[in-house]
Design a protein with these regions (language model features):
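Conserved functional hotspot residues or short segments at active or partner-binding sites
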Residues: 169-247
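Cleft-lining beta-strand/loop regions that shape enzyme active-site pockets
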Residues: 1-150, 165
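Polar, glycine-rich mid-to-C-terminal structural blocks
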Residues: 124, 129-196
Length: 247
């Protein structure tokens, strides 16, 4: 099998260049689209999007990147402090890549990474592999206190305010729980002291009404899970982790 792997370190977009009218501004979606075209020219049998260590970035890019793999529909729901819900929708109807898809995640995959992985999982478009993700399902803004308080020149710092929450199209939040992988890759380290769940007074997990979307269900999840269990059962390293109650 020929498997293409695209590592996505962040969800970036050059908003300044875009606002200045540049036609070739950089963005995650544009770069991934180009790489997919190159990989399909090499006749790949499947594609892996590697989001391990990706702490997030642009919501716009998380939405548009998801759109490369689904035809159309909602990608994520955003609920503000007043309870108003806005649905972010795939901005570009059509599919750039329709073949087998896997998404690699780990404990440091956060925010926009969780939006992308959660949408791919909800649509049944691909399989999520790795560790439970970071669990950051909130939106913050930074307020520069120096702009509002007259001082003697001393830097008063900045205040970070939570202003909204992310919810998957299936209705559940990514807060605290993150995205649970379809196939868990065992780790020798505990996850309880990592991510939002390790912070003092984090916002609790919540859910809202699911958005209207149509599942693609291109994955034989049952067959993949059975194959994974068989490989784990045969692997001495996995069995050692199981015996030590690490997984």
């Amino acid at each position: 099998l020929r498997i293409g792997v695209i590592q996505v370190p962040a969800f970036y977009r050059d908003f300044r260049a875009e606002s200045e009218g540049s036609r070739d501004f950089t963005s995650t979606t544009r770069d991934v689209r180009r790489l997919i075209s190159e990989l399909e020219g090499k006749r790949i049998d499947g594609l892996v999007i590697d989001l391990r260590g990706n702490g997030g970035g642009s919501l716009t890019e998380a939405t548009s990147l998801t759109g490369l793999f689904i035809d159309e529909g909602p990608v994520v729901q955003v609920k503000d402090a007043l309870g108003k819900v806005e649905v972010e929708v795939d901005p570009d109807p059509g599919v750039v890549y329709s073949g087998p898809l896997a998404v690699l995640v780990d404990r440091n995959s956060a925010s926009a990474s969780e939006i992308f992985a959660g949408a791919i999982q909800d649509y049944g478009r691909g399989i999520i592999i790795g560790e439970p993700t970071f669990g950051k399902g909130t939106v913050q803004t930074l307020i520069d206190l120096n702009r509002y308080v007259a001082g003697d020149g001393e830097d008063l710092g900045r205040l970070r305010l939570t202003m909204a929450e992310f919810f998957r199209v299936s209705g559940g939040s990514t807060q605290l729980k993150g995205v649970e992988p379809d196939i868990l890759l065992p780790t020798a380290e505990y996850l309880a002291d990592h991510g939002e769940r390790s912070l003092d007074n984090p916002l609790p997990w919540d859910s809202i009404r699911p958005a209207r979307y149509t599942k693609v269900s291109l994955v034989d999840m049952q067959g993949l899970l059975e194959g994974s269990r068989e490989r784990v059962a045969r692997d001495p390293g996995f069995q050692m982790l199981i015996a030590s109650e690490r997984i």
